[in-house]
A protein has these predicted regions:
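Short proline/glycine-enriched turn/loop motifs at strand-loop junctions of beta-rich domains
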Residues: 38-45, 77
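Beta-strand-enriched, solvent-exposed domains that form extended recognition/catalytic surfaces
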Residues: 38-40, 54-56, 71
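Solvent-exposed serine/threonine-rich low-complexity stretches and specific carbohydrate-binding patches
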Residues: 56-64
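A broadly conserved detector of short glycine/acidic/proline-rich loop/turn motifs that flank catalytic sites
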Residues: 39, 51, 147
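The feature marks proteins involved in alpha-glucan
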Residues: 1-34, 63-145, 150-157, 164, ...
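Short beta-strand elements bearing conserved aromatic residues within extracellular beta-rich modules
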Residues: 45-47, 82
Length: 170
């Protein structure tokens, strides 16, 4: 078991980990994309998607410890659709979207989309320093709530990305 997995499992098993999405789901890797899912009672899991012509035998996942399964694909591409093919303890096979996926296909499709987050470089050091000098009573309150999935969509029915939503909201 590698150090990253061991550290994640310690946190995940003790608290459920509010940052599980940093390890589970689909992430860019040196040699393609890595897929990880927590399914402690599964007999078998594979990743199936348009990158392997939805062949459930093509990319089997391996159990790596703590109920976590993992597979790496060098053929998967950003924007491609995928699902997990899970064989349960009773032998039943089901196709599941990624519970930690960052994007989903527009309805009625139920696939996840390969769209891992990119590294973001923060440039707000001055703002954060100034913010620490004031109490919350000295700062204005800004509250705006919007449901990202239903507020606005592209003409083809697909969802806006968080970046696209931010451009229109801010």
């Amino acid at each position: 078991m590698n150090k990253q997995l061991a550290a994640f499992l310690r946190q995940f098993e003790s608290t459920g980990s509010s940052e599980a999405d940093r390890y589970l789901g689909c992430h860019a890797a040196e040699d393609g994309f890595v897929f990880r899912v927590w399914a402690p009672n599964a007999q078998r899991i594979s990743v199936t998607g348009d990158f392997n012509f939805w062949n459930e035998e093509d990319l089997p996942m391996m159990p790596v410890g703590g109920g976590i399964w993992e597979a790496v694909s060098k053929f998967a591409k950003r924007g491609g659709a995928y699902k997990y093919c899970v064989t349960g303890a009773d032998g039943t096979k089901v196709y599941k979207a990624d519970p930690y996926g960052n994007r989903a296909m527009p309805l009625p499709e139920t696939s996840s989309v390969i769209d891992p987050p990119e590294k973001f470089r923060w440039t707000d050091a001055v703002y954060r320093r100034n913010k620490l000098r004031q109490t919350s009573l000295q700062r204005p309150v800004n509250i705006y709530e919007v449901h990202a999935g239903s507020w606005k969509r592209h003409d083809d029915g697909s969802y806006l990305s968080y970046t696209e939503l931010a451009e229109q909201l801010i």
